[in-house]
Amino acid sequence: MSDRLFIFDTTLRDGEQVPGCQLNTVEKIQVAKALEQLGVDVIEAGFPVSSPGDFKSVVEISKAVTWPTICALTRAVEKDIDVAAEALRFAKRGRIHTGIGTSDSHIKYKFNSTREEIIERAIAATKYAKKYVEDVEFYCEDAGRTDNEYLARVVEAVIKAGATVVNIPDTTGYCLPDEYGAKIKYLMEHVDGVHNAILSTHCHNDLGMATANTVQGVLNGARQVEVTINGIGERAGNTSLEEVAMVFKSHKERDIITNITTNKIYSTSRMVSSLMNMPVQPNKAIVGRNAFAHSSGIHQDGVLKNAQTYEIIDPKDVGIDDNAIVLTARSGRAALKHRLHVLGVDLEQEKLDKVYDEFLKLADRKKDINDDDVLMLVGKDRTATHRIKLEYLQVTSGVGVQSVASICLNLSGVRRYEAAAGNGPVDAGIKAVKKAISNSDMTIQEFLIQAINKGSDDTGKVHMQVEYNGATYYGFSANTDIIAASVEAFVDAINKFIVD
């Protein structure tokens, strides 16, 4: 029988501590609802005593969310616990997360206390929280640097006092995976009554070990993991939810299951990235833009024959439509043939060989090759079959002036002229296009601008991800005018789903 692993998401508490990533209450509720749909078991909604904003967020999230447990953080201080309990009064399932530092450095320098006094405070805080809620989690701050024998005494004491979950944080990201795993194993073997509670991991990524430490913790007995979307968090971040979920989905032989609906991972990642204005690293595992992109010719050939040759995860399992074959100078004939086929062009081998020679010459000059380049090599225009074409664009913008865009779209031979004001020239152009096609239901999920070369007069390329009717479409354009490139990319994406 598989072991159930509980997912405790702290994106809205620990994750939001990243400078510049603060959310308002409405945005926090939006994230909380997405986490509920994703299938997390516990949402740490905030630290109520820290600010009126955090208090309000915990209250409103408690009202808005139905299934996950809503957790509020406190110190081992009665006032903190009182405020947390008040904030959780509307929660269908509430949890108070209280605790104190247990490492010698915390005991001596932070609390000017002794080991015995810390245990007494830990017991008192746990019992006090139990007056309000049945579900009490206790954290042993800096457990990663706490010696195992003393840590076991603390854990045993708070479990006897009524803690239902005990959190073993590697607060500073100091532990190596074997050390952290051994720590959890020691507690499982030496704490009397350990099976009356759940041990939880909470790992930071200061040395890049957060996910590895978390996995080792689980393999040694922890059954709750504290994680964030995209691994965001203080300093170098926290354990990534998507990484842990996919580790155990991929390694079914471990018989550890979560409640995560994995095909919602990518959309949740992008939503959090957008709301927090924190881009996802392109090579980030699971959710990075390049996570399922292949540019090596050998890899491309293998993936085209069978994706399992170089992919251990089906992109659809995390909510990505397909892998990406990126054309570069390292790409082989198989990749070029595949891209041409996708674009509706099938060539005989002799013709393909000639086109491939020209492709290599072009690829040596350009960083990567887009669809326009590929079609140019075979004498075709990608936009020739587009139902919608941008024929004219003029934008006025400046300091102290509202941006206004005027456009002419050719819709299957019929010209439509429109103008719109917006928050900047790109927004104005997008709004004008939406007016011209009488459709404003599509939303931009991702908007990436890159310089192809150096210098202010060189070409910029725009990649745009557009969502419409629950499906995702991609648009691309390159132009020395970055505003024009942005609007062209939007029109390119629209042409993928607009039909007669």
UniProtKB/Swiss-Prot annotation:
It is an enzyme of class 2 (transferase). One of its GO terms (molecular function) is 2-isopropylmalate synthase activity. GO terms for biological process: L-leucine biosynthetic process. GO terms for cellular component: cytoplasm. Its cofactor is Mn(2+). PROSITE patterns: AIPM_HOMOCIT_SYNTH_1, AIPM_HOMOCIT_SYNTH_2, PYR_CT. It comes from Parabacteroides distasonis (strain ATCC 8503 / DSM 20701 / CIP 104284 / JCM 5825 / NCTC 11152). This is 2-isopropylmalate synthase. Catalyzes the condensation of the acetyl group of acetyl-CoA with 3-methyl-2-oxobutanoate (2-ketoisovalerate) to form 3-carboxy-3-hydroxy-4-methylpentanoate (2-isopropylmalate). PANTHER family: 2-ISOPROPYLMALATE SYNTHASE 1, CHLOROPLASTIC-RELATED (PTHR10277:SF9), HOMOCITRATE SYNTHASE-RELATED (PTHR10277). Residues 389-500 are annotated as: Regulatory domain. Pathway: Amino-acid biosynthesis; L-leucine biosynthesis; L-leucine from 3-methyl-2-oxobutanoate: step 1/4. It is found in: Cytoplasm. Belongs to the alpha-IPM synthase/homocitrate synthase family. LeuA type 1 subfamily. It catalyses: 3-methyl-2-oxobutanoate + acetyl-CoA + H2O = (2S)-2-isopropylmalate + CoA + H(+). Its EC number is 2.3.3.13. Residues 5-266 form the Pyruvate carboxyltransferase domain. It holds the Pfam family LeuA_dimer. Its main location: cytoplasm. SMART domains: LeuA_dimer (SM00917). Keywords: Amino-acid biosynthesis, Branched-chain amino acid biosynthesis, Cytoplasm, Leucine biosynthesis, Manganese, Metal-binding, Transferase. Mn(2+) binds at D14, H202, H204, N238. Homodimer. NCBIfam families: leuA_bact (TIGR00973), PRK00915.1-3 (NF002086).
